Every structure is written in structure tokens, then in C-alpha cells.
Curated annotation (Swiss-Prot):
EC number: 2.4.1.1
Activity regulation (UniProt): Allosterically regulated through the non-covalent binding of metabolites, being activated by AMP and inhibited by ATP, ADP, and glucose-6-phosphate. The activity is also controlled by post-translational modifications including phosphorylation.
Signal peptide: none
In-chain residues carrying the UniProt-annotated modification Phosphotyrosine: Y204, Y227, Y473
CDD domains: GT35_Glycogen_Phosphorylase
Described function: Allosteric enzyme that catalyzes the rate-limiting step in glycogen catabolism, the phosphorolytic cleavage of glycogen to produce glucose-1-phosphate, and plays a central role in maintaining cellular and organismal glucose homeostasis.
Protein name as catalogued: Glycogen phosphorylase, muscle form
Organism: Rattus norvegicus
């Protein structure tokens, strides 16, 4: 007779291996049905399209969850070094289709929904974008998480679960209006709340110094509750975690008020604590010293570091008891990557934990912190650099200010020893800036407290070393690296452009999807007529599809055979949407001058959001829409030319417009765009680039060959020389008749007859204080655009150039970027090894 099973043996039956996997269309249909009825509690008589989307999302999520659990089991068994990517922005977009692509479920789900009388594409369109970012910074973080999972790295993305993401943009009467992005109003099927890991975060209070050391006391506490979202790698059974923190008031919040009849007010006051995770600040290129923003930055850092240390101390899966108490191995097991300066408080916070709570001495705590942290810089614009007022830090985070002062003193002692007698250097390198308002320079804090500092394109990294961080480079040159940005080919080719992905796979197989350098094999097809024809056909199909979308969404009819000329990015003076406007007006004026002259038909599309408080950016949007009103309604223009402003540009719209674009506008003033990643997405999807030698454009032109790029304008050195000489817009105005005509039109109200002085601020800016020197590049830009039109007349040569660009875009995979971070900053070797599937033994 067999002995009775122990409780431990019985529990072994609770295993992910015991669950049947979803492997075929029949299983998918059953699970869809089960979720519709049992999870959503609906039947087909009352189910809405959104219910069907949720049922499909839950069905696909089932396929993720077993892999997610197994991945975490694997990490706890192997105890690898873990990567923690801290970012205040994580611009994920939609999840359903990306998950199906990475798990190889797309065809089966398509067939299952078809058999159920549903259209999968329509269901995909119901999903809200997770718009937890302003633009490139947050989208880069999302691409990086995808690549870290694909490369088998034990990585975690940490950020804030903003209740309201980047605002929805509405264009009313040509003006941008902002609407709240209530992306969670229907719920989010991809996240899992983890209330058991809720952590306290402290603010305000004061510091007591005792014989045992410093104590931060009398603080206000806010709780950080984590929500986990799975991040699947590409077909390797790895599913990593993105953990977003939501602010909650503690149950005893303002309890003292209860005794004096203030119960209702105390409950209402809970909102004040919970405001921390309420909304994303919609501005990442102008620093605003808002207390709530500083609270957000510390909130994510404090919760994340507690989580990291808990995980470091416990090495067994599910074990909450500390196993490690010694921090010598911390930098060997933990890498913290700071995505810009927003999470820079991780440096003083880690020191606070190690010194005040774990009782390490300062030198040991500093050594551990520096070896653990690394910093990525994303901007050279001085107005974007974070410089927090000391008085704000003193009130909100008094202990951290003391620690920053201590870091600064010790750091400046090192500088003084390395450069004796150079007093001005001490002033320039100090973490504390003296002035009318004393400030903490967060970039300086990051450089001092990290073992690696990287820019995000080769030219950007050189600018950092030669200009804004020159003093720091001279002190510690070994810290400075370059890591050129990249994009995930899963979302930015396979998902958004399946036709092109298939045409490529027919020639070189599918391995390129996780090894993008293999695209170079396409160079041998440059003269293959069938391949040229297939690439051109896919582009035309994408253009027809996007034209139909514009007609449905915007009620705008465009010519799908026209050249699709696209500039989509945040609206900012340095990105020079104004230069694009000057070209549009030039084309219009030429048509009016010579109405019978042949012109290559163009549809010029501009999209992007302006920060709500950025007056000039909002005026630029108004100008674009005003020009469109004139051009699109002028019978002399006809079908040759259209100007469209793409409202509410976001990840899901990018996935539609980028595959349809013929020409990608990357026209920032040389030396201002750190890298750019939109440029890479267009290149991979078969658009040619017109651009300046700025950011990653330089490396893209190098890869493709400058002959296969429409390069124009000043180089960085030219801009520097012009700055020294003094830029004078009047010179260009006097010398160039076409430019003069445009400025006269803007000044006289040609594009705003009801309000002739509407664009006076734009005219005043470009004529008298244009930091980004639009006029200086105008002539070359117009000539370069003429070359674009000339080449477009020759479809075969155009497509050959497109193929050359696609074939040489492999360098710009985020897999390459992350492999470099892993080897050169985190001290890890990426792995292409596939984890066992859930029904296999680990």
C-alpha cells in the first residue's frame, strides 16, 4: 500500500507543467469562449467588440503567463546578474499584436477569430495605446525591454503606472487642444496587480543625527503598489517583467483628523498622495521645477531600490526571508541603468539605504553605488537638463540633500587634487550650482555616481565629451562610451509591415528578425527585377491602405500615387518643422507662378504633439494647418499636392504611417538631436531619408553610403563657426527671393486673412532670435528636395536605393544596442538560448 502523500508532495501537483498549453486553433477558440463567458461574464447577445477584444487578449495572455512564471523560476534557479532599467517614461503602445508576433500565435489567432465570425484587425484597433511617454525616450525604453527579453537577459523595466498618459491631441480650428488620456478606463488585461509587494515611500520630515548615524524621521508616507506587465522575447520562451508603481495613500493617512470629525476630509485628502502617479508630465525638452515631478522621480526610485534589495537578499523563488546580508556581491548581481537624469535620485537613495539602514561605511557604500549605476544621456539642449532648486530638495528630501552635499564635497576634493589651482573648474563641475536660486545639477550627480556614461549616437557622444561634459571627460575619460540607439525589428517591421517582412523572408529566411545584420544579404538582390517589383508593390499596398485610413479617420482624400513625404515627431523648434513649412510654401508659390509646369505629386504629412505650455510649438501646428487650408483648397494645385497634419500622433499611428512613407524628414539643426529613432524606423520600412548630419543620421548615411541618402545643410562644425561669426537671418532674407516672399506672406496674413498678424511671433523668431538657424539651411534643403523629386520620377532607381537602405539598416536593431550595453556596461554576455517551453522540464 502506497504511503500517503505529504503536503509538500501534494503541492507539487500545483505546477505550470500540469497545464495544457494553447497550441492550435481549436484550443484558442475554446479559451476565447471560456474567457468571454467566465472572465467577462458576457454572452454573444450582449458582448460588444471591446468584450471580444478582451476575450482575445486574455486568451493570448494565457499563453504568456506560463512562460512568464517559468522564466522567473529559471532566474531564481540560475541567480544571474539582473538588469534594472529605470525610466520615468515607458511608451509601450499596444500589446496584443506584439505578443502574438513574439509568441508565433498570429496566424492561429487570425484563423480562430475568423472561424468565430470576427475580424482580428478590428479587434486589435480597439486596444488603447499605453502612452506612458512623450516620444523617443519612452519608446526607446520599450524597444530595449523587447530586446533584453529576446537576448535572454534577466531584465526588469521599472517606471510609473500613470493613470493618464500623454494627452490625446485634438485639432480644433487648426489649434492643438489637449484631452486627458484615460487609457485605463476599461481596464488593462495585460497587467497584474501585486499588492503583496506594496512598499512605503517617504517624503518631507527631518534628519536626526545620533551616535548610530543619521535617521530620517517625521516623514509623510505614500505607498507604492506594483503592477506587473509581461514582456515576451522573440520566440525564445523568455518573458521578462515591466513593473510599474501606482501611488496609494496608507490606511492611516491623516488619521489624527478622524478624532476631530474630519473623517470625510481625511478620506478626500488621500487623493493628494495618489496624485503622484496620476499623470505623465507632457514635456521632456524643457525642465520645469515642479514639486510633483520631483515626487514622481523619487517615488519610482525609492520603491524600485527597495524591490531590488529585497530580490538581491532573497535568492530562492517565493522566499521573502533575507538570505544575503553582505553587499560585496551587489554590483556583481545588480546593474541599474538610469534612462536620462529623471531617475538620478537612485544614487543618493542607494547610499542612504546602504549607510543609514544597512550600516555600511561611506567609502564602501560609494564603491557599491558607483559600480552598480550607469547613466544614459539623451539631450544636449541646456534648457532640458534637470537642475532642482535646493530649497525644494531640502523640504521634500532633506536626507538626500545632505548626501548630495557629501558626494559633492568628496568629488570636488578629487577634482582639486587632479587639477590643482583650477578654481573655475571646481565651479563648473560642482553638483551644486550657486546663483540667485541654488540648484542641484542632476547630470553632474549622475556622472559622479556612475561607472559608465553613454550618449546615444556617435556624434552625440563626441559632443558630450567636447562640450557639456568636457570637464568630466578630462577627469574620468574611461567612464564615457557611445551606445547608438536602435529599434526592435519585431514591432517596427514584422508587426507593422508584414508584407515587407514576408518579401524579405522569401529571399533570406526568417533568421534576420532576431539577427538584423542578415539584411545585408539583400544587397545581392539589388538588380533582381522580381525583388525590386515585390518591394515596390508592398510599398504601394501600404500607401493604398494608409490612404484609405486617412479617408476614414480624417475625411481627407489623397493621391496614393503621390510621393508620401512624412515628418512625424514631437513639435519642437530644434526639430525644424518650420523648415518643412518653408519648403511647402516654396512648392505652392512655384505652382502659382507656373501652373502648367510638371510637378512630381506630393502628399506632405506632418504629425506630432506640442507640450501644452510651449507657445512656439503650438504656433507651428497652427501654421501647418493654415498652410494646409490654403494649399488643399486651391484649384490651381489640384491633385498634385496635399498638406496633412496627422492628429494625435502615437505609437499605433506610427505603425500605420511609417510603412507607407516614401520620404523621411530628419532635418534638425546639426548638433541638436541626440540620436533619433524614428529615422531608423523609416529606413527599415523602405523610406529614403532627407536629413542633416545630426544624431544617428550620420551613422545611417555611413551604413547606406552617402549617395543613398539625401544629405543637406550645415555640419556641426559649420554651426559652431556660424555661432562664432554671429548668425544673421536678415542676410538670407535679403539674398534669397523665394525666402523673402514666404516671410512677406506670413507677415501680411496670406495664410491667415482673418487675422493678418497671427504669425507675427513666428516671423519675429525666425528673423531675430532663431537658435536653430532655419534660414541657414533653406537653400540647400530646397535643392535637395528637388533631387528627391527627380529620383522619384525613376521608380526602378528609387526602389534600388530603398533596397540598399533596408539592407544596411541592420546596425540599428535594438538587439545590437542592448548586446553592447550588456557586454560593455553591465558585464554580461547576451544569450540566444531558448528556454524550455512550459510543458518541458527546466
Amino acid at each position: 500500500m502506497s504511503r500517503p502523500l505529504s503536503d509538500q508532495d501534494k503541492r507539487k501537483q500545483i505546477s505550470v507543467r500540469g497545464l495544457a498549453g494553447v497550441e492550435n486553433v481549436s484550443d484558442l477558440k475554446k479559451n476565447f469562449n471560456r474567457h468571454l463567458h467566465f472572465t467577462l461574464v458576457k454572452d454573444r447577445n450582449v458582448a460588444t467588440p471591446r468584450d471580444y477584444y478582451f476575450a482575445l487578449a486574455h486568451t493570448v495572455r494565457d499563453h504568456l503567463v506560463d512562460r512568464w512564471i517559468r522564466t522567473q523560476q529559471h532566474y531564481y534557479a540560475k541567480d544571474p546578474k539582473r538588469i534594472y532599467y529605470l525610466s520615468l517614461e515607458l511608451y509601450m503602445g499596444r500589446t496584443l499584436q506584439n505578443t502574438m508576433v513574439n509568441l508565433a500565435l498570429e496566424n492561429a489567432c487570425d484563423e480562430a477569430t475568423y472561424q468565430l465570425g470576427l475580424d482580428m484587425e478590428e479587434l486589435e484597433e480597439i486596444e488603447e495605446d499605453a502612452g506612458l511617454g512623450n516620444g523617443g525616450l519612452g519608446r526607446l525604453a520599450a524597444c530595449f525591454l523587447d530586446s533584453m527579453a529576446t537576448l535572454g537577459l534577466a531584465a526588469y523595466g521599472y517606471g510609473i503606472r500613470y493613470e493618464f498618459g500623454i494627452f490625446n491631441q485634438k485639432i480644433c480650428g487648426g489649434w492643438q487642444m489637449e484631452e486627458a488620456d484615460d487609457w485605463l478606463r476599461y481596464g488593462n488585461p495585460w497587467e497584474k496587480a501585486r499588492p503583496e509587494f506594496t512598499l512605503p515611500v517617504h517624503f518631507y520630515g527631518r534628519v536626526e543625527h545620533t551616535s548610530q548615524g543619521a535617521k530620517w524621521v517625521d516623514t509623510q508616507v505614500v505607498l507604492a503598489m506594483p503592477y506587473d506587465t509581461p514582456v515576451p522575447g522573440y520566440r525564445n520562451n523568455v518573458v521578462n517583467t515591466m513593473r510599474l508603481w501606482s501611488a496609494k495613500a496608507p490606511p492611516y493617512f491623516n488619521l489624527k483628523d478622524f478624532n476631530v470629525g474630519g473623517y470625510i476630509q481625511a478620506v478626500l485628502d488621500r487623493n493628494l498622495a495618489e496624485n503622484i502617479s496620476r499623470v505623465l508630465y507632457p514635456n521632456d525638452k524643457f525642465f520645469e521645477g515642479k514639486e510633483l515631478r520631483l515626487k514622481q522621480e523619487y517615488f519610482v526610485v525609492a520603491a524600485t531600490l527597495q524591490d531590488i534589495i529585497r530580490r538581491f537578499k532573497s535568492s530562492k523563488f517565493g522566499c521573502r526571508d533575507p538570505v544575503r546580508t553582505n553587499f560585496d556581491a551587489f554590483p556583481d548581481k545588480v546593474a541599474i541603468q538610469l534612462n536620462d537624469t529623471h531617475p538620478s535620485l537612485a544614487i543618493p537613495e542607494l547610499i542612504r539605504i546602504l549607510v543609514d539602514l544597512e550600516r555600511l561605511d561611506w567609502d564602501k557604500a560609494w564603491d557599491v553605488t558607483v559600480k552598480t549605476c550607469a547613466y544614459t544621456n539623451h539631450t544636449v539642449l541646456p534648457e532640458a537638463l534637470e537642475r532642482w532648486p535646493v530649497h525644494l530638495m531640502e523640504t521634500l528630501l532633506p536626507r538626500h540633500l545632505q548626501i548630495i552635499y557629501e558626494i559633492n564635497q568628496r568629488f570636488l576634493n578629487r577634482v582639486a587634487a587632479a587639477f590643482p589651482g583650477d578654481v573655475d573648474r571646481l565651479r563648473r563641475m560642482s553638483l551644486v550650482e550657486e546663483g540667485a536660486v541654488k540648484r542641484i545639477n542632476m547630470a553632474h550627480l549622475c556622472i559622479a555616481g556612475s561607472h559608465a556614461v553613454n550618449g546615444v549616437a556617435r556624434i552625440h557622444s563626441e559632443i558630450l565629451k567636447k562640450t557639456i561634459f568636457k570637464d568630466f571627460y578630462e577627469l574620468e575619460p574611461h567612464k564615457f562610451q557611445n551606445k547608438t540607439n536602435g529599434i526592435t525589428p519585431r514591432r517596427w517591421l514584422v508587426l507593422c509591415n508584414p508584407g515587407l517582412a514576408e518579401v524579405i523572408a522569401e529571399r533570406i529566411g526568417e533568421e534576420y528578425i532576431s539577427d538584423l545584420d542578415q539584411l545585408r544579404k539583400l544587397l545581392s538582390y539589388l538588380d533582381d527585377q522580381a525583388f525590386i517589383r515585390d518591394v515596390a508593390k508592398v510599398k504601394q499596398e501600404n500607401k493604398l491602405k494608409f490612404s484609405a485610413y486617412l479617408e476614414t479617420e480624417y475625411k481627407v482624400h489623397i493621391n496614393p500615387n503621390s510621393l508620401f513625404d512624412v515628418q512625424v515627431k514631437r513639435i519642437h523648434e530644434y526639430k525644424r518643422q518650420l523648415l518643412n513649412c518653408l519648403h511647402i510654401i516654396t512648392l505652392y508659390n512655384r505652382i502659382k507662378r507656373e501652373p502648367n509646369r510638371f510637378m512630381v505629386p506630393r502628399t506632405i504629412m506632418i504629425g506630432g504633439k506640442a507640450a501644452p505650455g510651449y507657445h512656439m510649438a503650438k504656433m507651428i501646428i497652427k501654421l501647418i494647418t493654415a498652410i494646409g487650408d490654403v494649399v488643399n483648397h486651391d484649384p490651381a494645385v489640384g491633385d498634385r499636392f496635399r498638406v496633412i497634419f496627422l492628429e494625435n500622433y502615437r505609437v499605433s499611428l506610427a505603425e500605420k504611417v511609417i510603412p507607407a512613407a516614401d520620404l523621411s524628414e530628419q532635418i534638425s539643426t546639426a548638433g541638436t538631436e541626440a540620436s533619433g529613432t524614428g529615422n531608423m524606423k523609416f529606413m527599415l520600412n523602405g523610406a529614403l531619408t532627407i536629413g542633416t548630419m545630426d544624431g544617428a543620421n550620420v551613422e545611417m548615411a555611413e551604413e547606406a553610403g552617402e549617395d543613398n541618402f539625401f544629405i543637406f545643410g550645415m555640419r556641426v562644425e559649420d554651426v559652431e563657426r556660424l555661432d562664432q561669426r554671429g548668425y544673421n537671418a536678415q542676410e538670407y532674407y535679403d539674398r534669397i527671393p523665394e525666402l523673402r516672399q514666404i516671410i512677406e506672406q506670413l507677415s501680411s496674413g496670406f495664410f491667415s486673412p482673418k487675422q493678418p498678424d497671427l504669425f507675427k511671433d513666428i516671423v519675429n523668431m525666425v528673423m531675430h532670435h532663431d537658435r536653430f538657424k532655419v534660414f541657414a539651411d533653406y537653400e540647400e534643403y530646397i535643392k535637395c528636395q528637388d533631387k528627391v523629386s527627380e529620383l522619384y520620377k525613376n521608380p526602378r532607381e528609387w526602389t534600388r536605393m530603398v533596397i540598399r537602405n533596408i539592407a544596411t539598416s541592420g546596425k540599428f536593431s535594438s538587439d545590437r544596442t542592448i548586446a553592447q550595453y550588456a557586454r560593455e556596461i553591465w558585464g554580461l554576455e547576451p544569450s540566444r538560448q531558448r528556454l524550455p517551453a512550459p510543458d518541458e522540464k527546466i
